[in-house]
UniProtKB/Swiss-Prot annotation:
Primary gene name: panB
NCBIfam families, alphabetized: panB, PRK00311.1
The protein's name: 3-methyl-2-oxobutanoate hydroxymethyltransferase
Cofactor(s) demanded: Mg(2+)
Recorded family membership: Belongs to the PanB family.
Active-site residue numbers: 187
Catalysed reaction, written as an equation: 3-methyl-2-oxobutanoate + (6R)-5,10-methylene-5,6,7,8-tetrahydrofolate + H2O = 2-dehydropantoate + (6S)-5,6,7,8-tetrahydrofolate
Biological pathway: Cofactor biosynthesis; (R)-pantothenate biosynthesis; (R)-pantoate from 3-methyl-2-oxobutanoate: step 1/2
Example of a GO MF term: magnesium ion binding
Length: 269
């Protein structure tokens, strides 16, 4: 098993991984069963992402998921994850109004879920908010590049940091670090720029569609393991085809129930 060598991963282990060049594995998780499996597999961090709005609740965007919904999901993950560090997204509308709102939302997540950190989107414009949360004793993971909560303002899911956008991305990265974040997600960023950001920062960078030069990688598990049978982003590599397997299994079950083959003597009392 590769990755961080620790019985219980904490933010200090993420800093150590950055310093010694150990790659950091991250997957999303939204329930106890997948959290237990990913934890046993040695995944270093589990992200209870607002992507649950899409892959769990079936909504078109992440914007409608609430803090209450995120907390329910995060509770399940933290119950099952014994080793992995659990991060919870602060959803849209729970931290942008004021720094006080952000702190209150983060405090609620930590108190009610048992998570180790929260994640918020934004760079320079969110630096003071990150600082306030960190000053409240709560670890923060930043998120820059393409930020899904701002997809309408950004014109949809498009690569960030090209051309003159590289300077903004670097400024965002340094602002997030200076604000006290322990790590930062780089989403849909040219590999060369993501590598440059990684080389300049002292905190860990976690890439998603950002090439191989970041300190770690994160994917939505339904994409990575083929549970989502629809169109996937270019940056996804499928490690399994669980959606097709589940479809065939469900068909087999329906057929056996219909034919009377299930339950049989073995499954009966």
């Amino acid at each position: 098993m590769s990755g961080i060598d620790a019985k219980k991963i904490r933010t200090r282990h993420i800093h150590e991984a950055k310093a010694n060049g150990t790659k950091i594995s991250v997957l999303t998780s939204y329930d106890a069963m997948t959290a237990a499996i990913f934890d046993e597999a040695g995944i270093d961090m589990l992200l209870v992402g607002d992507s649950a709005a899409n892959v769990v609740l079936g909504r078109e965007t992440t914007l409608s998921i609430t803090l209450d919904e995120m907390i329910v999901l995060a509770k399940a993950v933290t119950i099952a994850a014994k080793r992995a560090l659990v991060i919870v997204d602060l959803p849209f509308g729970t931290y942008e109004v004021s720094e006080q709102q952000a702190v209150e939302s983060a405090v609620r997540v930590m108190r009610e879920t048992g998570a180790a950190a929260v994640k918020i989107e934004g760079g320079v414009e969110m630096a003071s908010t990150i600082r306030r949360i960190v000053d409240a004793g709560i670890p923060v993971c930043g998120h820059i590049g393409f930020t899904p909560q701002s997809e309408h303002a950004l014109g949809g899911p498009v690569v960030q940091g090209r051309g003159s956008g590289a300077d903004k991305l670097l400024a965002d990265a340094h602002a997030v670090q200076a604000a006290g974040a322990f790590a930062v997600v780089l989403e849909m960023v040219p590999a060369e720029i993501a590598t440059e950001v990684t080389n300049q920062l002292d905190i860990a960078t976690i890439g998603i569609g950002a090439g191989n030069g970041t300190d770690g990688q994160v994917l939505v598990w339904q994409d990575a393991f083929g549970f989502n049978r629809g169109r996937k982003p270019r940056f996804v590599r499928e490690y399994a085809t669980l959606g097709d397997q589940l479809l065939e299994a469900a068909r087999a079950y329906a057929d056996e129930v219909g034919s009377g083959a299930f339950p049989g003597e073995v499954e009966s009392y």
